[in-house]
């Protein structure tokens, strides 16, 4: 039964709500005269009003009621704003409860001067953005690119059993693919060890200019939809603020009681509850000018106020006065004390909840010594699976960090050879398990029981943003699904670094395998190394790209990135059986340098090379070394310098990237005047772009050139002309003294012909490839 709410409580709620709305309108429009102490003048209005109103009043309404229940029930709660825009609403609430002034002491007086500053800064040059940016205390989801709020919320509550994440989902946002999938994430939550997500669907009826689907279908259909998703929907509908306050307050009281019941029962029963959610149906632009309330026209700036539309000044003034500011502010512009006392204690506010600023962070414990994981290597003779060996290292990371480390991926942990991980944990799963299922458990550290890359990435981001650790792994081609999502996280990191009070977060570590050179069995659709290109233009103090080429370089690289903060680290690695090249000691030294000569492979004997052979990635390295072995036999007089790149950004100039080599270092390594043939894992333009300003312009790159099909592993390399024979044919072109003797060229052409005939006859690579060993 719903608890009755008194008239006094309704009045308190309404005063707070009116204040939040007044501030939100002021932030949108006003430059001066924040208290309306005189009639509004056009000079009081921002010359360029930028922002959105449509979602703000509903978010203010929700926040108003969260303040009440946080205080009443002493809740540990965060607020996640999913709807696009409406950033001024969250700023307004932070301002009212004092969390804004706590982070920005220049607002501590809370008077008319502070109010003027608050209004001016919103969507104003040198001020703050129109979304819930990292500058906003309590934010972990900006809400610019839509669809990620709910997965962020579910990531935030993992291993955070006392937390309630109230996630407001716009009804337009609910139509995005990532958000539509995220409703299913409640199946992965264990109510005993995880917190609770309280989704609130803001059903205001419109997007920018179109109606929303969920607002136009029958309510019983909407309710049935969410029941089918595993939720217990509560409908809060209306447009009369006081009636709505009563309904919302009573509903939230009932929900808190229900959440407490779920938490209590979870200690003694293994079950998946129906989690509460609210369907909040209010008019878009609620409480705004009557001409636009409930229409899509309230989405952005509901009324235009400028010199050409000066008559609208009166409408704006009437709108602001409808909130009765004289009842909300003292004469000096400070907020009335009874409204301030309505708020929870400062340390309990959503704006200052430690979860939103890395405050629950426990430092990641990593193995002290990599020798335990070292693969004993006989150079070029030993064969092993890099990803499988890395799994043994990650297994121990999980054992050392039982409640603050997760592994995310779309049902690929076994496919990507992380088998050893399951010696220490299971997949996280909290719904029906049947006899033939494997590796499922309520408290697993592996989040890969949902197939959406968006959902996996979103949960990991939510986990990292609340101070924990982990990584996502994916097939290389299909990480492209989250291109823009990772871009948004890069923007978040960039901005957060510039905010003094934002704490460092663990890096977003992305491990790509099943890459383009190992997708001969799946074909063209599974071959796309373009995620490297996607990350390359991002801020140099944020992006790191690594291409380890054997087990020991992979383990060394992964150990390194796991220790970093505030980066996006990309690692591309092999999962198939491959030749092994470096001991762990050699790997650690090589990875620390990031790029270096493989002196054991070079044939210069300390003399000036005829050609530089460079490589980055496991497959290009294999083919370069195979080419060298052929040349050592057939042209022993040829002086070849072999360079391997693990840290791709070493190729960038040091004045553009902190990892970059100086020109002097680069020239010493690559020479200033000898031809460079670079075999690269991805698209060739990446290397050309990174080395564009270097002295030596005699750069020739082989890489993936969009040639692929279902074929053999070696044929994939042949199709893209990155194989040993094509590399030697290139070397002949670039080293004039090799052009006189046609035998080497004829040998390569004949081997390519033999290869083609062999695969089309037998369906597998010839022995010269499969049995090749370094010597």
Question: Predicted regions span which residues?
Answer:
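Short alpha-helical segments and helix-capping/turn motifs at coil-helix boundaries
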Residues: 10-11, 47-48, 59-77, 137-138, ...
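Cofactor-binding active-site loop characterized by glycine-rich and histidine/acidic residues
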Residues: 34-190, 419, 458-459, 463-466, ...
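Non-catalytic terminal/interface segments that mediate subunit docking, oligomerization
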Residues: 53-57, 66, 79, 98-103, ...
């Amino acid at each position: 039964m719903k608890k009755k709410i008194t008239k006094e409580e309704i009045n308190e709620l309404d005063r707070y709500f009116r204040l939040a709305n007044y501030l939100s309108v002021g932030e949108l429009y006003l430059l001066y005269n924040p208290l309306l102490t005189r009639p509004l003048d056009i000079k009081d209005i921002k010359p360029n009003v930028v922002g959105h109103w449509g979602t703000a009043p509903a978010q203010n309404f929700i926040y108003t009621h969260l303040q009440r229940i946080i205080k009443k029930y002493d809740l540990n709660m965060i607020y996640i704003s999913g709807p696009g825009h409406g950033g001024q609403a969250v700023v307004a609430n932070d301002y009212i409860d004092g969390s804004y002034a706590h982070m920005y002491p220049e607002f501590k007086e809370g008077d008319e001067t502070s109010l003027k500053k608050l209004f001016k800064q919103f969507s104003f040059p040198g001020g703050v953005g129109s979304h819930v940016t990292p500058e906003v205390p309590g934010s972990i989801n900006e809400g610019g690119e839509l669809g990620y709020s709910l997965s962020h919320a579910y990531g935030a509550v993992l291993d955070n059993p006392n937390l309630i994440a109230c996630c407001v989902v716009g009804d337009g946002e609910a139509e995005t693919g990532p958000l539509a999938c995220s409703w299913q994430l409640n199946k992965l939550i264990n109510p005993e060890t995880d917190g609770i997500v309280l989704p609130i669907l803001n059903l205001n009826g419109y997007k920018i200019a179109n109606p929303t689907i969920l607002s136009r279908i029958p309510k019983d259909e909407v309710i049935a939809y969410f029941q089918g998703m595993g939720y217990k929907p509560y409908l809060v509908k209306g447009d009369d603020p006081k009636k709505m306050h009563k309904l919302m307050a009573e509903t939230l009281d009932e929900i808190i009681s229900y959440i407490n019941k779920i938490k209590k029962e979870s200690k003694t029963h293994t079950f998946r509850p129906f989690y509460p959610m609210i369907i909040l149906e209010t008019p878009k632009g609620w409480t705004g000018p009557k001409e636009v309330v409930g229409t899509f026209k309230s989405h952005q700036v509901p009324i235009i106020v400028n010199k050409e539309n000066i008559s609208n000044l009166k409408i704006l003034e009437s709108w602001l006065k409808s909130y009765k500011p004289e009842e909300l502010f003292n004469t000096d512009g400070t907020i009335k004390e009874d409204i301030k006392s309505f708020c929870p204690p400062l340390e309990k506010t959503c704006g200052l909840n430690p979860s939103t600023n890395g405050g629950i962070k426990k430092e990641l414990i990593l193995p002290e010594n990599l020798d335990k994981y070292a693969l004993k290597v006989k150079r070029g003779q030993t064969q092993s699976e890099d990803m499988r060996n890395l799994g043994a290292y990650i297994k121990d990371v999980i054992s050392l960090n039982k409640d603050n480390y997760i592994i995310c991926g779309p049902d690929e942990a076994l496919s990507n050879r992380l088998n050893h991980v399951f010696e220490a944990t299971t997949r996280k799963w909290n719904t029906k398990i049947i006899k033939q299922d494997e590796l499922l458990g309520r408290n697993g550290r592996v989040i890969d029981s949902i197939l959406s890359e968006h959902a996996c990435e979103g949960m990991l981001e939510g986990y990292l943003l609340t101070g924990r650790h982990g990584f996502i792994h994916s097939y290389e081609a299909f990480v492209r699904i989250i291109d823009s999502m990772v871009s948004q996280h890069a923007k978040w990191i960039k901005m957060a670094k510039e905010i003094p009070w934002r704490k460092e977060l663990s890096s977003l570590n992305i491990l790509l395998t099943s890459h383009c050179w190992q997708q001969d069995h799946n074909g063209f659709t599974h071959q796309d190394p373009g995620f490297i290109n996607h990350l390359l233009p991002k801020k140099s103090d944020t992006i790191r790209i690594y291409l380890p080429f054997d087990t020991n370089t992979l383990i060394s690289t992964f150990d390194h990135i796991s220790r970093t903060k505030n980066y996006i680290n990309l690692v591309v690695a092999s999962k198939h059986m491959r030749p092994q090249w470096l001991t762990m000691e050699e790997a650690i030294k090589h990875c620390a340098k990031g790029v270096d000569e493989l002196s054991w492979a070079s044939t210069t004997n300390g003399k000036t090379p005829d050609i530089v052979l460079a490589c980055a990635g496991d497959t290009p390295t294999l083919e370069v070394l195979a080419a060298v072995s052929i040349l050592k036999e057939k042209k022993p007089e040829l002086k070849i310098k072999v360079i391997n790149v693990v840290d791709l950004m070493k190729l960038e100039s040091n004045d553009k990237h902190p990892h970059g080599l100086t020109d002097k270092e680069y020239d010493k390594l690559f020479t200033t005047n000898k031809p460079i043939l670079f075999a690269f894992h991805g698209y060739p333009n990446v290397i050309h772009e990174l080395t564009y300003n270097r002295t030596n312009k005699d750069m020739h790159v082989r890489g993936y050139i969009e040639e692929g099909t279902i074929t053999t592993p070696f044929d994939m390399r042949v199709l893209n002309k990155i194989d040993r024979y094509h590399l030697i044919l290139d070397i002949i072109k670039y080293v004039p003294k090799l052009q006189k003797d046609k035998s080497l060229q004829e040998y390569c052409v004949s081997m390519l012909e033999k290869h083609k005939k062999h695969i089309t006859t037998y369906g597998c690579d010839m022995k010269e490839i499969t049995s090749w060993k370094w010597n």
